[in-house]
Amino acid sequence: MPADKRVSSIDLLRGVVMVIMALDHVRDFFHADAFHHAPDDLDHVSAATFLTRWITHYCAPVFVFLAGTSAWFVHRRRTTTQLSSFLVKRGIWLVFVEAVIISFLWTFNPTLPAIFLGVIWAIGISMIALAGLVHLPARGILLFGLVLVLGHNALDDLHPAGLWWGILHEQVFRMVDGRLIGFIYPLIPWIGVMALGYVFGGLYAPERDPAQRRRLLRLLGMASIALFLVLRLTDVYGDPRPWEPGRGPAFAFLSVLNATKYPPSLHYLLMTLGPAFLFLSVAEARPGPWARRLIVFGRVPFFYYVMHLVVIHAFAILAVVLLGRPWTDMVLDTFVIREPHLQDYGFSLPVVYGVWVAVVVLLYPACRWFAQLKRERTDWWWLSYL
């Protein structure tokens, strides 16, 4: 496998989760229930609403994990020092983009004194941490990642005062110098996920037998799912929110799936990464036409992420105008689902799915163009940061 050759199965998986991610963000801007109830509130939302949210849980873990895997591929054509420098610079760039550009795209309000630090922030900080970890042996990085992912739920009952603990292990919103900052993605487990993703890249080394890799992927996937089921059903460890039996089989089933995302519990990570490994084990065949389209999205994830927020928010402005409301209703003073003047706004779930399809279809030509540009202009060094 040449050093510059992309692995289509990884791009395909990334493309799948990028497309699914757009569904969750369309739901934020369009679903009537989103303005009244959390989608994981099983006492108030329908099974369809819960499952619409649940399927998007696969996005962040796979996104962060494969960012670590991508760093391993970069390491194959750069020295460790060069990789470390690249990760620091890209990490700082991603934090800047999250704080300045993406926070604005969520609100379209340039004067709002608020910053929302989500998955791009978590990836950026995790890359900076990985920049130091790559100087360790692979076993050391693996051990570090496992300790964070497997062990961080032992910290669930710790709630020390101060902002730093919130940043590391508890979702927190704080006023800092007159500006609201939402630390939405606590860092400790995500740093571990990226570290494991980096070590995982070794499965795609040129000397690795593809059949052996597929067997290992199947084993990883089945073991992760089995461990999830054992831990979840026994509730001995791994998630601060236990499932609830005794309210009927349908409720119990959804309750088992309702693992904690902020911070991502061990149950949550096993539930999402296990199927991802199984997907990779069967995704190495020659891609068909639909898979090739998804691969396009997977090759330009950062571009897709930024542009999908632009398109979704623009569609939301169009929606309020068509409803006879002022377009400024979508110039927000807080996160969209908490906006007081939108409590009487929103659409049914089928409309949400229709808008989602329209967003993805509209993004495809732009992503195909940008993917082609990145292939052709390898002399533009700055494209590696996009």
Predicted region positions:
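Alpha-helical transmembrane segments and their immediate juxtamembrane cytosolic regions
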Residues: 1-386
